[in-house]
């Protein structure tokens, strides 16, 4: 198939009816406000009125000489060698974003560009309260023009998980740093959550230029009013719109400390 359909979540999640609209507006914000390459997607409705999130597969070539050809794609759990048999059921939550950035540098020829995009996605996920951006939600795939060249795939599975799991144990699915058991910034020690000092240290470690990292963080904080306008136009319930706005204000405040 060329598309993936994601209907409403099981009802034991909070605000479960809004899950398709949540993912739709979050992907839209990433693409239009933050200029992050994302999988193409849309929100459709079944005859009974239930919403369904539809995303276009980016591992299947849809036109030209190679139409129908499936590109080779590996997520970062696979690339890191994480398997449930050895690493347990929570294997995709092992590792760190810093380690993923290292693996990008090991496998992507245009690594500086790819690592910067990765930094922007991690920052965006933090802002929108996506607490499920684990190792399987980032992938590499080869190019149709050159099957030996790999690059970061468009971003996918972007949504505000706090709407559905309001008491998530952690703000991020993975630690920012490889040595988080032994290292914490003074900001994190004082506040118990990530802020700009943490993301600047993350940028330094993975090789994102300091001035550009600062600009991306400022853009994230400054984007909240435009994000709220887009949320107002979304297809979520009024309750979920209000919660989402509250969430991003809270994260922007954390970044703006």
Regions found by a protein language model. Give the residues of each.
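Regulatory N- and C-terminal appendages and interdomain linkers associated
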Residues: 106, 113, 146-152, 221-257
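Catalytic-core segments of enzymes that bind and process phosphorylated/nucleotide-bearing substrates
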Residues: 75-98, 142-210
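Conserved kinase catalytic-core segment
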Residues: 17-34, 93-167
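Residues within well-ordered alpha helices
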Residues: 29-30, 202-206, 230
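A glycine-rich phosphate-binding loop feature that marks nucleotide/adenosyl-phosphate handling sites
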Residues: 45-51, 137-143, 220
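Conserved ATP-binding subdomain of kinase catalytic cores across diverse folds
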Residues: 1-88
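Short alpha-helical scaffolding segments that buttress acidic/His motifs in well-ordered protein cores
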Residues: 118-122, 217, 230
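Short, surface-exposed acidic
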Residues: 40, 206-219
């Amino acid at each position: 198939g060329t598309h993936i359909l994601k209907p409403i979540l099981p009802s034991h999640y909070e605000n479960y009816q809004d899950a398709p609209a949540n993912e739709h507006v979050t992907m839209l914000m990433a693409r239009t406000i933050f200029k992050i390459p994302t999988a193409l997607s849309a929100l459709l409705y079944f005859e009974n009125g239930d919403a369904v999130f539809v995303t276009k597969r980016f591992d299947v070539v849809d036109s030209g000489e190679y139409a129908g050809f499936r590109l080779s794609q590996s997520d970062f759990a696979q690339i890191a060698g994480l398997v449930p048999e050895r690493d347990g059921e929570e294997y995709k939550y092992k590792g760190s974003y810093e380690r993923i950035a290292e693996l990008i540098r090991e496998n992507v020829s245009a690594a500086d560009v790819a690592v910067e995009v990765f930094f922007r996605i991690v920052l965006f996920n933090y802002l929108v309260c996506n607490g499920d951006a684990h190792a399987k939600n980032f992938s590499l795939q080869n190019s149709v023009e050159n099957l030996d060249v790999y690059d970061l795939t468009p971003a996918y599975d972007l949504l505000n998980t706090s709407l559905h799991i309001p008491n998530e144990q952690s703000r991020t699915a993975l630690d920012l740093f490889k040595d988080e058991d032994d290292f914490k910034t003074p900001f994190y020690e004082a506040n118990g959550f990530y802020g700009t000092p943490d993301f600047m240290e993350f940028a330094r470690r993975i090789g994102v230029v300091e001035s550009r990292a600062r600009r991306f963080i400022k853009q994230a904080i400054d984007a909240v009013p435009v994000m709220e306008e887009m949320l107002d136009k979304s297809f979520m319930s009024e309750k979920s719109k209000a919660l989402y706005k509250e969430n991003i204000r809270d994260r922007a405040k954390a970044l703006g400390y």
